[in-house]
Amino acid sequence: MIKKCRICKGNLELILDLGKQPLANNLCKNKSERKKLYELKFCACKKCGTYQHNINISLDDLYSQYFYSSSVSKDLNDNALSFSEEIKKKYKNKSIKILEVGSNDGYLLKYLKDEFFCLGIDPSNNMTKISRSYGIKTLKDFFNAHSSKFIKNNFGNFDL
């Protein structure tokens, strides 16, 4: 459990206690199917005001099978479609390259891939597979110094 602010090491104040919760969208009808639950408490730093949850979840636990798919949200899809139309209008007849970090299931890039070179990067196995099924070039990795160097060496610079 986190006792001090991740940013400034100030004291944390409990704002909201949600009790034991599964990871994002990992909801099960039967208790026997239930995966690991986490004590989820939201805190605010008394010093810098940053809001944060009180636990560190291993990246493997969080992303090996990620359960939140952006495409299931009508609002997110509508927003992605509207945003992609703005990009298409602004960069019409231009050859640009688009990189989306945390591309999830490709919900944004699927609207742009036919007009522009698009690359997604996401650490989740299942979201990467979905994105690739749309024909989107997607790297399964975290975005960090190593992956950014790989991207630059293999794909060059990106415009967006």
What is each PLM-predicted segment?
Residues 94-104:
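Conserved class I S-adenosyl-L-methionine
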Residues 149-160:
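A short acidic, Gly/Pro-enriched loop at the edge of an enzyme's catalytic core
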Residues 1-75:
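N-terminal juxtadomain amphipathic helix
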Residues 135-150:
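Conserved SAM-binding strand-loop segment of SAM-dependent methyltransferases
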Residues 124-126:
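Conserved SAM/SAH-binding beta-strand->alpha-helix loop
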Residues 105-115:
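Conserved SAM-binding loop of SAM-dependent methyltransferases across substrates and taxa
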Residues 78-94:
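Conserved alpha-helix/loop element of class I SAM-dependent methyltransferases that forms part
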Residues 117-122:
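Conserved SAM-binding motif I beta-strand of class I
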